């Protein structure tokens, strides 16, 4: 997959719009633009079987962790109006992300 440009950044709050976790909201932990995927806190949970390793002081067992979901399956959440698309205001260095519905600033999230 080609490198995907996205308006979603790390630590943004997003809502899942499709898939098994539809309707859930969470904070973005990591963006993987070359694969078009993101990691969202407490979304897309999978179980990972971990072997014990006494040298590294790892107990072992079944651990739950987030798996990556497609960027197209999430929408940025505006504090005022909920899930929304992103619009841009300004030019050059002054360019900022704003809510497409109400126009509030999303840059400082």
Swiss-Prot record:
<dbReference type="InterPro" id="IPR014722">
    <property type="entry name" value="Rib_uL2_dom2"/>
</dbReference>
<dbReference type="GO" id="GO:0019843">
    <property type="term" value="F:rRNA binding"/>
</dbReference>
<dbReference type="InterPro" id="IPR041988">
    <property type="entry name" value="Ribosomal_uL24_KOW"/>
</dbReference>
<comment type="function">
    <text>One of two assembly initiator proteins, it binds directly to the 5'-end of the 23S rRNA, where it nucleates assembly of the 50S subunit.</text>
</comment>
<feature type="region of interest" description="Disordered">
    <location>
        <begin position="1"/>
        <end position="24"/>
    </location>
</feature>
<dbReference type="GO" id="GO:0005840">
    <property type="term" value="C:ribosome"/>
</dbReference>
<dbReference type="Pfam" id="PF00467">
    <property type="entry name" value="KOW"/>
</dbReference>
<keyword id="KW-0689">Ribosomal protein</keyword>
<dbReference type="InterPro" id="IPR005824">
    <property type="entry name" value="KOW"/>
</dbReference>
<protein>
    <recommendedName>
        <fullName>Large ribosomal subunit protein uL24</fullName>
    </recommendedName>
</protein>
<dbReference type="InterPro" id="IPR003256">
    <property type="entry name" value="Ribosomal_uL24"/>
</dbReference>
<comment type="similarity">
    <text>Belongs to the universal ribosomal protein uL24 family.</text>
</comment>
<dbReference type="Pfam" id="PF17136">
    <property type="entry name" value="ribosomal_L24"/>
</dbReference>
<keyword id="KW-0694">RNA-binding</keyword>
<keyword id="KW-0687">Ribonucleoprotein</keyword>
<keyword id="KW-0699">rRNA-binding</keyword>
<comment type="subunit">
    <text>Part of the 50S ribosomal subunit.</text>
</comment>
<dbReference type="GO" id="GO:0006412">
    <property type="term" value="P:translation"/>
</dbReference>
<dbReference type="InterPro" id="IPR008991">
    <property type="entry name" value="Translation_prot_SH3-like_sf"/>
</dbReference>
<dbReference type="GO" id="GO:0003735">
    <property type="term" value="F:structural constituent of ribosome"/>
</dbReference>
<dbReference type="GO" id="GO:1990904">
    <property type="term" value="C:ribonucleoprotein complex"/>
</dbReference>
<comment type="function">
    <text>One of the proteins that surrounds the polypeptide exit tunnel on the outside of the subunit.</text>
</comment>
């Amino acid at each position: 997959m080609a490198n995907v440009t996205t308006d979603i950044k790390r630590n943004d709050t997003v809502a899942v719009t499709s898939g098994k976790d539809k309707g859930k909201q969470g904070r973005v932990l990591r963006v993987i633009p070359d694969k078009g995927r993101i990691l969202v806190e407490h979304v897309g949970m999978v179980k990972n079987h971990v072997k014990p390793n006494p040298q590294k002081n790892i107990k072992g067992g079944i651990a739950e962790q987030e798996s990556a979901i497609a960027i197209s399956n999430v929408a940025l959440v505006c504090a005022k109006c909920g899930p929304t698309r992103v619009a841009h205001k300004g030019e050059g260095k002054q360019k900022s992300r704003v809510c497409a519905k109400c126009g509030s600033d999303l840059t400082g999230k």
